[in-house]
Structures are given as C-alpha cells and as structure tokens.
Amino acid sequence: MKIENIMTKKLITLSMDAPLSKAKETLESYAIHHLLLTDDDGLLAGMITDRDLYKHLSPTVGTSQESHRDTAQLQKKSHQIMARNLITAQAHDPLSKTILLLHDNHISCLPIVDKDNKAIGIITWRDVLKVLALQYRKKQKT
C-alpha cells in the first residue's frame, strides 16, 4: 500500500510569518494537532504542533488573567517556534516506510511533499493505526 492511498490530501497550512495567535486559532478551529507552515513560495518550511504552541504560551492566554506579556507572546511569528528540517515522505512511498519513519524518529506525523518540497499531504500515526486495524479485522473475518 502506498502513502497516497491513506494520506490526508486536504491540507490546512499557514504562512511561517503568521502570528502565533493565527496558528492557535487555526489549530483550534480545525481541531487539528499538526499545522504545516509554508514560505513565500508555498514550499514546506516547518511545522507547529498543538503541543509546541502550548509550551510557548502562558496558560492564562484567553482568560481574564491574561497579561500584556501573554498578548505580546501571541504576536510572535510562527517561524520563531516552528520545527524545521522536517522528516518527510513522498506519496509513492510504501506505507512500511511511513511506519518506520514514525517509529524510528519518535514523531507523530509526516508531511508528504512533492519533488519541489511542496506539501501535498500529511499522514499521522492515527492514519497508520486505522489502516492496520482494518487489515487486522479483515483477517479475522476470513
């Protein structure tokens, strides 16, 4: 099975120059855990996870106790906290490669890029687990 058969193709991306407030809003409004960031040419530049974001924000953000410092933190640019030098895969790669990359690198998702490093999909450990569970259930029925 190829990655392209199970990857999420409808990507939600954000400019790496967007403020953290926009990254937070995007992660929350789409209920996603991984946000791919692009450069001015639309190429994959990095990623912010919900965990990365909350590590950099005060727990008082969005509450009545929010301070000026909290507000200033939200204006930082996404590229200031994004993960760079991402491990990626290509759509034609086998699913087995995805499993090994996720496991061996202790990561929870893989951006899928084309030959020009443009993000064309994303695959998470949950996507892989879903496929494996379906295959297991099929075997049980036979």
Annotate each PLM feature.
Residues L14-I32, L37-T38, T88-H106, V113, ...:
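The conserved cystathionine-beta-synthase
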Residues M1-K10, T49-I87, I99-H103, A119, ...:
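Tandem CBS (Bateman) regulatory domains
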Residues P59, S108-C109:
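Glycine-centered flexibility motif
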Residues L27, L35-D52, L102, L110-R126:
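A glycine-centered beta-loop-beta connector
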